[in-house]
Amino acid sequence: MRGHLVATVALGVALLAGCSEDRVPTGADPSNGSTGTGPSDRSTGPGPDESVATVATGFEVPWGLVPLDDGSLLVGERETAQVFRVVPGSDPSLLTTVPGVAPDGEGGLLGLAVPDDSAWHDGEPAPFFAYATTDTDNRVLRVEPGDGSEPAVEVVLDGIPKAGNHNGGRIAFGPDGYLYVTTGDASDGASAQDPDSLAGKILRITAEGAPAPDNPDPGSPVLSLGHRNVQGLDWDSSGRLWASEFGQNALDEVNLIQPGGNYGWPQVEGPGGEPEFIDPVVSWPTQDASPSGLAVGADGALYVAALRGESLWRVPLTDADTGTDAGTGTGTATGTDPGSVTVGEPERLYEGEFGRQRSVVTGPDGELWVLTSNTFRGDPAPDDDRLLRLDPAAQAGSP
């Protein structure tokens, strides 16, 4: 059994039908620091930091992560297609299992998104969106959990190429109300440059699956192209869209996304200086990053979850005119102006303390939430995988 109880008060937990290895995630006392055997056994840097709290443990390849305004979170598992609701201080509860998911390599149940979480405030399940791999493709689904019965699933967008690797998979509703979808090249680099393919793109669609009417090509869902495998995206207070992208063997990237922009893959990896392509604003050697999730923190910096790099990278953003942090908020997602922001020197946080980091999001109170990803690749600790909460006051000065 893979469940590991680390809460100060033991809670009775029933085994969930269909859980991998009869495993059930368990809650931890979020008021405690990140003590235990996991981080210290694996750490090659400073010891566990008390600014990080372990909130839940025992997840199996967690991927999707959505914070809700009531303080709870949704966590999806890639292999089992199970979605849990996590209330800090309690054991995660199984919300639903998404049917029709066919895990394959890096594919499975990937990103989750909620258009308006006000429907969750009464404690009842509400619809959410999911990016999932099936037997034939990757697709975006609208899932209504129901009351314990089979969930109602509606296909929003299908036909996204799938493969064992490079499936993209992050989805998020932007400040403009449209759904943004990241796709990988599905191990076919040429498809990233094909405007008629959904592979290797960032897509922008309505909640019903239609192309956003003011896309670069109004009849196409494509917002940007030339991507290898984007797995993170978020907006700053001015509505600028930032995305993290896996490189191949040389350089990983953070890009400032411009509508209609071509980011160069497979012709370019990292900065290329080619006039027809947009260079990344940040790049790292692949062994230092392999970036998955990305979030704009309450301090205005980008936070990038690194898998191979086993770190959380902090990238400062400064408004070029005022010299102040960009911060978080709302804006017009397609109104990007690359010259209005200055990107600072990346800072590596929590190196080696928690292993591979898959997802990072900013919560309603400015806290950061991080999912580890050690149960697929890596060196899992006994309580992996974990949901961690970072103290906002420590974001700018972590070890």
Where are the regions that the model predicts?
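Blade-edge beta-strand/turn elements of extracellular beta-propeller
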Residues: 45-57, 89-103, 142-162, 198-229, ...
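Short, solvent-exposed mixed-charge patches
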Residues: 397-399
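Acidic, Gly/Ser/Thr-rich repeat motifs that build Ca2+-stabilized beta-propeller blades
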Residues: 20-189, 240-247, 288-319, 335-337, ...
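C-terminal motif of bacterial Sec signal peptides marking the signal peptidase cleavage site
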Residues: 15-18
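N-terminal export and membrane-targeting signals
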Residues: 1-10
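Repeat-solenoid scaffold signature
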Residues: 222-249
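Short, solvent-exposed loop/turn segments at secondary-structure boundaries
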Residues: 191-194
